Amino acid sequence: MAGPKRAAILMLALGEQYGGKIWSMLDDDEVRQLSLEMSTLGTVEVDTVEDMLLEFVSRMSASGALMGNFDATERLLQQYLPPERVNGIMDEIRGPAGRNMWEKLSNVQEEVLANYLKNEYPQTIAVVLSKLKPEHAARVLGIFPEDLALDVVNRMLKMEAVQKEVIESVEKTLRTEFMSNLSQTRRRDAHEVMAEIFNNFDRQTETRFITSLEEDNRESAERIKALMFTFDDLVKLDSGSAQTLMRNVDKDKLGVALKSANEDVRNFFFGNMSSRAAKMLQDDMAAMGPVRLRDVDEAQALLVNLAKDLAAKGEIMLTKNRADDELVY
Protein backbone atom coordinates (compact mmCIF):
# COMPACT_ATOMS: atom_id res chain seq x y z
CA MET A 1 0.00 0.00 0.00
CA ALA A 2 1.39 3.40 -1.01
CA GLY A 3 2.67 5.85 1.60
CA PRO A 4 -0.03 8.55 1.14
CA LYS A 5 -2.82 5.99 1.56
CA ARG A 6 -1.18 4.58 4.69
CA ALA A 7 -0.88 8.12 6.06
CA ALA A 8 -4.56 8.80 5.27
CA ILE A 9 -5.65 5.72 7.23
CA LEU A 10 -3.40 6.78 10.10
CA MET A 11 -4.92 10.28 10.23
CA LEU A 12 -8.45 8.88 10.17
CA ALA A 13 -7.51 6.51 12.99
CA LEU A 14 -5.99 9.33 15.04
CA GLY A 15 -9.20 11.31 14.73
CA GLU A 16 -9.79 14.89 15.82
CA GLN A 17 -8.21 14.73 19.27
CA TYR A 18 -4.82 13.34 18.31
CA GLY A 19 -4.40 14.50 14.72
CA GLY A 20 -4.66 18.25 15.18
CA LYS A 21 -1.01 19.01 15.81
CA ILE A 22 0.02 16.92 12.82
CA TRP A 23 -2.37 18.77 10.49
CA SER A 24 -1.04 22.14 11.66
CA MET A 25 2.53 21.11 10.75
CA LEU A 26 1.72 20.14 7.16
CA ASP A 27 2.06 22.56 4.24
CA ASP A 28 -0.78 23.14 1.74
CA ASP A 29 0.47 20.58 -0.79
CA GLU A 30 0.78 17.90 1.88
CA VAL A 31 -2.68 18.69 3.23
CA ARG A 32 -4.19 18.53 -0.27
CA GLN A 33 -2.52 15.20 -1.07
CA LEU A 34 -3.50 13.68 2.26
CA SER A 35 -7.05 15.04 2.02
CA LEU A 36 -7.47 13.61 -1.47
CA GLU A 37 -6.38 10.18 -0.26
CA MET A 38 -8.72 10.37 2.74
CA SER A 39 -11.70 11.42 0.65
CA THR A 40 -11.36 8.43 -1.70
CA LEU A 41 -10.57 5.69 0.81
CA GLY A 42 -14.06 4.35 1.16
CA THR A 43 -14.28 1.50 3.68
CA VAL A 44 -10.97 0.23 5.09
CA GLU A 45 -11.41 -3.29 6.41
CA VAL A 46 -10.26 -4.02 9.93
CA ASP A 47 -7.74 -6.67 8.85
CA THR A 48 -5.92 -4.13 6.70
CA VAL A 49 -5.81 -1.59 9.50
CA GLU A 50 -4.66 -4.18 12.06
CA ASP A 51 -1.84 -5.35 9.82
CA MET A 52 -0.58 -1.80 9.42
CA LEU A 53 -1.27 -0.17 12.77
CA LEU A 54 -2.22 -2.57 15.57
CA GLU A 55 -1.86 0.14 18.17
CA PHE A 56 -4.77 2.08 16.62
CA VAL A 57 -7.37 -0.73 16.64
CA SER A 58 -8.87 0.53 19.89
CA ARG A 59 -9.54 3.94 18.34
CA MET A 60 -11.50 2.60 15.37
CA SER A 61 -15.25 2.57 15.03
CA ALA A 62 -17.39 -0.20 16.54
CA SER A 63 -17.44 -2.00 13.21
CA GLY A 64 -13.69 -2.13 13.18
CA ALA A 65 -13.49 -0.15 9.97
CA LEU A 66 -12.83 3.43 8.92
CA MET A 67 -15.00 5.27 6.44
CA GLY A 68 -13.17 7.89 4.39
CA ASN A 69 -15.33 10.23 2.32
CA PHE A 70 -15.61 13.90 1.40
CA ASP A 71 -17.83 14.85 4.33
CA ALA A 72 -15.69 13.09 6.94
CA THR A 73 -12.56 14.68 5.52
CA GLU A 74 -14.10 18.16 5.51
CA ARG A 75 -15.37 17.84 9.09
CA LEU A 76 -11.94 16.77 10.29
CA LEU A 77 -10.12 19.60 8.48
CA GLN A 78 -12.55 22.16 9.91
CA GLN A 79 -11.35 21.31 13.41
CA TYR A 80 -7.80 22.49 12.74
CA LEU A 81 -7.65 24.75 9.68
CA PRO A 82 -9.17 28.15 8.81
CA PRO A 83 -12.45 27.96 6.83
CA GLU A 84 -10.97 29.55 3.70
CA ARG A 85 -8.13 27.04 3.63
CA VAL A 86 -10.53 24.13 4.15
CA ASN A 87 -12.82 25.38 1.37
CA GLY A 88 -9.88 25.73 -1.02
CA ILE A 89 -8.63 22.24 -0.27
CA MET A 90 -12.06 20.66 -0.64
CA ASP A 91 -12.66 22.57 -3.89
CA GLU A 92 -9.53 21.02 -5.34
CA ILE A 93 -9.97 17.44 -4.18
CA ARG A 94 -13.62 17.36 -5.30
CA GLY A 95 -12.68 18.76 -8.68
CA PRO A 96 -10.87 17.08 -11.58
CA ALA A 97 -7.91 14.82 -10.82
CA GLY A 98 -4.41 16.28 -10.64
CA ARG A 99 -1.70 17.18 -8.15
CA ASN A 100 -1.88 20.90 -8.91
CA MET A 101 -4.06 23.44 -10.69
CA TRP A 102 -2.47 22.91 -14.11
CA GLU A 103 -2.80 19.13 -14.02
CA LYS A 104 -6.43 19.55 -12.98
CA LEU A 105 -7.12 21.93 -15.88
CA SER A 106 -5.61 19.38 -18.26
CA ASN A 107 -8.28 16.93 -17.07
CA VAL A 108 -11.19 19.33 -17.66
CA GLN A 109 -13.00 18.68 -20.92
CA GLU A 110 -11.78 21.11 -23.57
CA GLU A 111 -15.23 22.53 -24.42
CA VAL A 112 -15.87 23.40 -20.78
CA LEU A 113 -12.47 25.04 -20.36
CA ALA A 114 -12.75 26.90 -23.67
CA ASN A 115 -16.20 28.27 -22.75
CA TYR A 116 -14.73 29.68 -19.55
CA LEU A 117 -11.49 31.04 -21.02
CA LYS A 118 -13.02 32.78 -24.02
CA ASN A 119 -14.41 35.43 -21.65
CA GLU A 120 -10.96 36.17 -20.21
CA TYR A 121 -8.30 38.57 -21.49
CA PRO A 122 -6.24 37.05 -24.33
CA GLN A 123 -3.05 37.52 -22.32
CA THR A 124 -4.56 35.56 -19.42
CA ILE A 125 -5.61 32.82 -21.84
CA ALA A 126 -2.07 32.71 -23.21
CA VAL A 127 -0.63 32.26 -19.72
CA VAL A 128 -3.08 29.47 -18.90
CA LEU A 129 -2.55 27.57 -22.15
CA SER A 130 1.21 27.84 -21.78
CA LYS A 131 0.92 25.86 -18.55
CA LEU A 132 -1.26 23.07 -19.94
CA LYS A 133 -0.24 19.88 -21.69
CA PRO A 134 0.36 20.74 -25.39
CA GLU A 135 -2.28 18.32 -26.68
CA HIS A 136 -4.92 19.77 -24.36
CA ALA A 137 -3.97 23.36 -25.18
CA ALA A 138 -4.28 22.51 -28.88
CA ARG A 139 -7.82 21.18 -28.45
CA VAL A 140 -8.86 24.27 -26.48
CA LEU A 141 -7.38 26.60 -29.11
CA GLY A 142 -9.25 24.71 -31.81
CA ILE A 143 -12.58 25.57 -30.16
CA PHE A 144 -11.94 29.32 -29.91
CA PRO A 145 -13.17 31.69 -32.64
CA GLU A 146 -10.38 32.07 -35.19
CA ASP A 147 -9.56 35.70 -34.36
CA LEU A 148 -9.27 34.95 -30.64
CA ALA A 149 -7.21 31.82 -31.25
CA LEU A 150 -4.79 33.73 -33.50
CA ASP A 151 -4.46 36.54 -30.93
CA VAL A 152 -3.66 34.01 -28.20
CA VAL A 153 -1.12 32.19 -30.40
CA ASN A 154 0.69 35.46 -31.15
CA ARG A 155 0.79 36.34 -27.46
CA MET A 156 2.16 32.91 -26.59
CA LEU A 157 4.86 33.30 -29.25
CA LYS A 158 5.92 36.67 -27.80
CA MET A 159 5.61 35.58 -24.19
CA GLU A 160 8.72 35.84 -22.08
CA ALA A 161 9.25 34.29 -18.65
CA VAL A 162 6.12 34.95 -16.63
CA GLN A 163 6.66 36.33 -13.15
CA LYS A 164 5.83 34.02 -10.28
CA GLU A 165 3.37 36.59 -8.90
CA VAL A 166 1.42 36.61 -12.18
CA ILE A 167 1.21 32.81 -12.25
CA GLU A 168 0.03 32.75 -8.65
CA SER A 169 -2.60 35.42 -9.37
CA VAL A 170 -3.95 33.50 -12.37
CA GLU A 171 -3.93 30.27 -10.39
CA LYS A 172 -5.85 31.91 -7.54
CA THR A 173 -8.46 33.27 -9.95
CA LEU A 174 -8.90 29.87 -11.57
CA ARG A 175 -9.28 28.22 -8.20
CA THR A 176 -11.88 30.68 -6.88
CA GLU A 177 -13.84 31.45 -10.06
CA PHE A 178 -13.64 28.23 -12.06
CA MET A 179 -12.68 25.18 -10.00
CA SER A 180 -14.88 26.07 -7.04
CA ASN A 181 -17.91 26.22 -9.34
CA LEU A 182 -16.84 23.14 -11.27
CA SER A 183 -16.62 21.07 -8.09
CA GLN A 184 -20.00 22.31 -6.84
CA THR A 185 -18.80 22.74 -3.31
CA ARG A 186 -20.36 26.07 -2.44
CA ARG A 187 -22.76 26.08 0.50
CA ARG A 188 -26.37 25.68 -0.60
CA ASP A 189 -29.35 27.18 1.13
CA ALA A 190 -32.57 25.31 1.88
CA HIS A 191 -34.17 26.39 -1.41
CA GLU A 192 -31.29 24.90 -3.41
CA VAL A 193 -31.53 21.63 -1.50
CA MET A 194 -35.29 21.53 -2.02
CA ALA A 195 -34.87 22.25 -5.74
CA GLU A 196 -32.68 19.15 -6.01
CA ILE A 197 -35.39 17.12 -4.25
CA PHE A 198 -38.09 18.50 -6.56
CA ASN A 199 -35.91 17.61 -9.55
CA ASN A 200 -36.25 13.96 -8.54
CA PHE A 201 -40.04 13.97 -8.21
CA ASP A 202 -42.16 12.49 -10.96
CA ARG A 203 -44.17 15.05 -12.89
CA GLN A 204 -47.43 14.65 -10.98
CA THR A 205 -45.78 14.77 -7.56
CA GLU A 206 -43.75 17.84 -8.52
CA THR A 207 -46.87 19.66 -9.76
CA ARG A 208 -48.80 18.75 -6.62
CA PHE A 209 -46.09 20.02 -4.26
CA ILE A 210 -45.37 23.19 -6.25
CA THR A 211 -49.09 24.03 -6.39
CA SER A 212 -49.49 23.52 -2.65
CA LEU A 213 -46.35 25.51 -1.90
CA GLU A 214 -47.50 28.39 -4.10
CA GLU A 215 -50.65 28.65 -2.00
CA ASP A 216 -48.70 28.58 1.25
CA ASN A 217 -45.49 30.44 0.34
CA ARG A 218 -45.38 31.81 -3.21
CA GLU A 219 -41.96 33.44 -2.79
CA SER A 220 -40.33 30.15 -1.81
CA ALA A 221 -42.13 28.31 -4.60
CA GLU A 222 -40.81 30.80 -7.17
CA ARG A 223 -37.26 30.52 -5.81
CA ILE A 224 -37.37 26.74 -5.99
CA LYS A 225 -38.69 26.79 -9.56
CA ALA A 226 -35.92 29.22 -10.56
CA LEU A 227 -33.27 26.91 -9.07
CA MET A 228 -34.59 23.66 -10.53
CA PHE A 229 -32.78 22.13 -13.48
CA THR A 230 -35.30 20.27 -15.61
CA PHE A 231 -35.31 18.14 -18.74
CA ASP A 232 -36.39 21.14 -20.84
CA ASP A 233 -33.29 23.04 -19.64
CA LEU A 234 -31.09 20.57 -21.53
CA VAL A 235 -31.75 22.61 -24.68
CA LYS A 236 -29.36 25.22 -23.23
CA LEU A 237 -26.42 22.81 -23.57
CA ASP A 238 -23.84 23.76 -26.17
CA SER A 239 -23.49 21.33 -29.08
CA GLY A 240 -20.39 19.65 -27.68
CA SER A 241 -22.03 19.08 -24.31
CA ALA A 242 -25.23 17.75 -25.91
CA GLN A 243 -23.27 15.27 -28.00
CA THR A 244 -21.26 14.16 -24.96
CA LEU A 245 -24.50 13.58 -23.07
CA MET A 246 -26.01 11.52 -25.89
CA ARG A 247 -22.87 9.39 -26.20
CA ASN A 248 -23.32 8.39 -22.57
CA VAL A 249 -27.03 7.52 -22.61
CA ASP A 250 -28.82 4.46 -23.91
CA LYS A 251 -30.61 5.40 -27.14
CA ASP A 252 -33.77 3.59 -26.03
CA LYS A 253 -33.90 5.75 -22.89
CA LEU A 254 -33.40 8.88 -24.99
CA GLY A 255 -36.29 7.87 -27.22
CA VAL A 256 -38.58 7.32 -24.24
CA ALA A 257 -37.52 10.66 -22.71
CA LEU A 258 -38.40 12.47 -25.94
CA LYS A 259 -41.84 10.87 -26.31
CA SER A 260 -43.62 13.65 -24.43
CA ALA A 261 -41.05 16.38 -25.07
CA ASN A 262 -42.08 19.57 -26.82
CA GLU A 263 -41.01 20.30 -30.38
CA ASP A 264 -38.12 22.58 -29.36
CA VAL A 265 -36.58 19.89 -27.15
CA ARG A 266 -36.97 17.20 -29.81
CA ASN A 267 -35.47 19.41 -32.50
CA PHE A 268 -32.55 20.25 -30.21
CA PHE A 269 -31.61 16.60 -29.72
CA PHE A 270 -32.25 15.62 -33.34
CA GLY A 271 -30.20 18.62 -34.48
CA ASN A 272 -27.19 17.42 -32.53
CA MET A 273 -27.22 14.01 -34.27
CA SER A 274 -26.38 12.98 -37.78
CA SER A 275 -29.38 12.90 -40.12
CA ARG A 276 -29.20 9.12 -40.20
CA ALA A 277 -29.09 8.78 -36.40
CA ALA A 278 -31.98 11.23 -36.00
CA LYS A 279 -34.09 9.31 -38.55
CA MET A 280 -33.37 5.99 -36.79
CA LEU A 281 -34.34 7.44 -33.41
CA GLN A 282 -37.55 8.92 -34.82
CA ASP A 283 -38.44 5.53 -36.34
CA ASP A 284 -37.72 3.81 -33.01
CA MET A 285 -39.94 6.30 -31.18
CA ALA A 286 -42.77 5.75 -33.66
CA ALA A 287 -42.46 1.98 -33.20
CA MET A 288 -42.71 2.26 -29.41
CA GLY A 289 -46.39 3.03 -29.42
CA PRO A 290 -47.93 4.45 -26.23
CA VAL A 291 -45.50 4.82 -23.31
CA ARG A 292 -46.46 5.19 -19.66
CA LEU A 293 -45.99 8.70 -18.29
CA ARG A 294 -44.06 7.21 -15.36
CA ASP A 295 -41.54 5.67 -17.77
CA VAL A 296 -41.13 8.99 -19.58
CA ASP A 297 -40.54 10.80 -16.28
CA GLU A 298 -37.94 8.21 -15.23
CA ALA A 299 -36.12 8.46 -18.56
CA GLN A 300 -36.08 12.26 -18.42
CA ALA A 301 -34.83 12.19 -14.83
CA LEU A 302 -32.09 9.78 -15.88
CA LEU A 303 -30.88 12.22 -18.56
CA VAL A 304 -30.96 15.18 -16.16
CA ASN A 305 -29.00 13.28 -13.50
CA LEU A 306 -26.52 12.02 -16.08
CA ALA A 307 -26.00 15.60 -17.30
CA LYS A 308 -25.29 16.71 -13.73
CA ASP A 309 -22.84 13.84 -13.21
CA LEU A 310 -20.98 14.71 -16.41
CA ALA A 311 -20.93 18.39 -15.44
CA ALA A 312 -19.51 17.54 -12.01
CA LYS A 313 -16.67 15.71 -13.78
CA GLY A 314 -15.98 18.75 -15.96
CA GLU A 315 -17.10 17.00 -19.16
CA ILE A 316 -20.03 19.30 -19.97
CA MET A 317 -21.36 22.69 -18.85
CA LEU A 318 -24.88 23.25 -17.57
CA THR A 319 -26.89 26.46 -17.35
CA LYS A 320 -29.87 27.19 -15.15
CA ASN A 321 -33.30 27.79 -16.59
CA ARG A 322 -32.89 31.56 -16.48
CA ALA A 323 -31.01 32.61 -19.58
CA ASP A 324 -29.08 35.38 -17.83
CA ASP A 325 -27.99 33.30 -14.83
CA GLU A 326 -25.31 30.77 -15.62
CA LEU A 327 -24.42 27.95 -13.27
CA VAL A 328 -21.29 25.87 -13.74
CA TYR A 329 -21.19 22.46 -12.08
Curated annotation (Swiss-Prot):
Its encoding gene is what? fliG
Q: Which cell locations does it reside in?
A: Cell inner membrane; Bacterial flagellum basal body
Main location per the UniProt record: membrane
Instruction: List the protein's name.
Output: Flagellar motor switch protein FliG
Q: Give the record's keywords alphabetically.
A: Bacterial flagellum, Cell inner membrane, Cell membrane, Chemotaxis, Flagellar rotation, Membrane
Q: Name one GO biological process term.
A: chemotaxis
What family does this belong to?
Answer: Belongs to the FliG family.
Q: What are the disulphide bonds in this sequence?
A: none
Keyword set includes Cell inner membrane: yes
Q: Name one GO molecular function term.
A: cytoskeletal motor activity
Segment forming the signal sequence? none
Q: Which InterPro entries match?
A: Flg_Motor_Flig (IPR000090), Flg_Motor_Flig_C (IPR023087), FliG_a-hlx (IPR011002), FliG_M (IPR032779), FliG_N (IPR028263)
Organism of provenance: Bradyrhizobium diazoefficiens (strain JCM 10833 / BCRC 13528 / IAM 13628 / NBRC 14792 / USDA 110)
GO CC annotation: bacterial-type flagellum basal body; plasma membrane
**Is Phosphoprotein set as a keyword in this record?**
no
Reported function: FliG is one of three proteins (FliG, FliN, FliM) that forms the rotor-mounted switch complex (C ring), located at the base of the basal body. This complex interacts with the CheY and CheZ chemotaxis proteins, in addition to contacting components of the motor that determine the direction of flagellar rotation.
Membrane topology, record value: Peripheral membrane protein
